[in-house]
Amino acid sequence: MGEMEREGAAAKAGAAKTGAAKTGTVAKTGIAAKTGVATAVAAPAAPANVAAAQGAGTKVALGAGKAAAGAKVVGGTIWTGKGLGLGLGLGLGAWGPIILGVVGAGAVYAYMKSRDIESAQSDEEVELRDALA
């Protein structure tokens, strides 16, 4: 049994299980079907652009399925050069990179300050040991 035959069989089995074949409704898979007697259902394990049409005279528009499954995420992020947002979905917009920069600068400052304090403490400990010895 070939891959296409397995996908078609899986689609028919899925349609029978959901009752879409009996009621004439279209499953919510992103595939637009012309209203009529036949039903179009995509296989659960198959890609969105593969559909099994049941009945005669069914016109299936696969463009909606392709757009839903294969579309690249288009967003304005720093990395794509299409905007100033970080693209994290936090709603920060152009403030996101500014906040990230301030937090990063604060972290670097705190790290450098702690290194200076540690080196000053170790110098004092060395001087104290020399004075006590």
Swiss-Prot record:
Impact upon substituting D116A? Makes wild-type crystals; protein is in magnetosome membrane
What changes when the gene is disrupted? No effect on bacterial growth. Magnetosomes are wild-type in number and size, but slightly less regularly spaced. Magnetite crystals are smaller, irregularly shaped instead of cubooctahedral, crystal growth may be incomplete. Magnetite-associated proteins Mms5, MamC and MamD levels are significantly decreased. Single non-polar gene mutation has a slightly reduced magnetic response, crystals are smaller and elongated. Magnetite crystals are elongated and their surface structure is altered, iron uptake is wild-type.
Variant or mutagenesis effect after changing L132G: Self-assembly of the mature protein is significantly reduced
Changing I117G has the effect of: No change in self-assembly of the mature protein
Q: How does it sit in the membrane?
A: Single-pass membrane protein
- What GO molecular function annotation could you give as one example from this UniProt entry? metal ion binding
Q: Where is this region: GL repeat?
A: 83-92
Changing W79A has the effect of: Self-assembly of the mature protein is reduced
Q: Spell out which residues lie on the membrane's Lumenal side.
A: 104-133
Region described as MIC, self-assembles, binds magnetite, Fe(2+) and Fe(3+): spans on this chain: 112-133
Post-translationally, this protein is described as follows, namely: Seen in gels as a band of about 6 kDa which has residue 75 as its N-terminus, suggesting it may undergo cleavage. 2 forms, a full-length and the shorter protein are both detected immunologically in magnetosomes.
Q: Which family does it belong to?
A: Belongs to the magnetosome Mms6 family.
Free-text comment about domains? Fe(3+) binding by the shorter form (residues 75-133) is inhibited by Ca(2+) and Mg(2+). The C-terminal 21 residues (magnetite-interacting component, MIC, residues 112-133) self assemble into multimers up to octamers; this fragment binds Fe(3+) which alters its structure. Another paper showed binding of MIC to Fe(2+) via Asp-123, Glu-124, Glu-125, and Glu-127 with a minor contribution from Glu-118. The isolated lumenal MIC binds Fe(2+) and Ni(2+), Ni(2+)-binding may not be physiological; in this paper binding to Fe(3+) was poor.
What is the recorded name of this protein?
A: Magnetite biomineralization protein Mms6
